Amino acid sequence: MKIRVLKQAFLAFVAMAFAATSSLAATATDPVLAEVTTGEWRSADEKSRDAARKPIENLQFWGLKPGASILEVQPGAGWWTRILAPYAARTGGRYSATAADLANPSITEAARKGRADFAARFADEKIYGKVELVNWGATAAPLAANSYDFILLSRVIHGWMRVEGLLDRHFANLAGSLKPGGVLAIEQHRENPGPQDPMAESGYVTEAFVIEAAERTGLRLAARSEINANPKDTKDHPFGVWTLPPTRITVPYGSGKAPDPNFDRSKYDAIGESDRMTLRFVKAIP
């Protein structure tokens, strides 16, 4: 009896030890990723959003690896850029970002300036390595085929839905530019399941819509995560997702109106950043 009890206790100990080891392995952080997320080149404001945006958890879920060739699509002000470019530089990888199409004869001066400003902001090669900008837009030439290990789409898909045919064009372009086995990582404001507004006026898109669009190109949904879920997000805000932090608008988006000083923001600030889907697609290896 005593021997059986001791044996059971020993087996329980081994099981707990194995579980603890497995848990640690599953949550072990890439040391370079940890380093670049705390880099002094990231502002205090950018770092303050880490609790909501969870950069390390997301990038590890998506499967970012040292030495990867990375493409960030429509990087905006560069919140992800200040993590991805230094990571690529420190691991022997390559970082590229899409930018205004300089080959477009109709390019506006504002678009040209935006591209130049982005390039200047990330020109320090000691921090960011060599940042490559690639032409992108409705009429841009296709990206180089089989060029990237990792492509990030962060909260941009809703904008593509407002131009007929653009969504499918962009997804096909990105799928073609992925190397076999490469990852398309998606973070997008998430609408509740149901019919999709074809124009995505609120900024929210259903998971089913995004998955179908990506899979039309032959990409395979490898995993989805609730890392960026926010159950407090009711998704019925007066000015769409942009009512929430960090944009926090108080008048209709793009209206050109002055901010409304009497708009009560407290309810929306309490919600925090949007509820977002987190998806990982993989390109098949022939």
Q: What residues fall within each predicted segment?
A:
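Class I SAM-dependent methyltransferase Rossmann-like catalytic core
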Residues: 33-61, 65
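A short acidic, Gly/Pro-enriched loop at the edge of an enzyme's catalytic core
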Residues: 141-151
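A short glycine-rich, Lys/Arg-flanked "PGG" loop and its adjoining helix->strand segment in the class I
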Residues: 167-180
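Conserved class I S-adenosyl-L-methionine
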Residues: 67-76
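Helix-to-beta-strand junctions that scaffold the AdoMet/dcAdoMet cofactor pocket
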Residues: 89, 160-161, 178-180
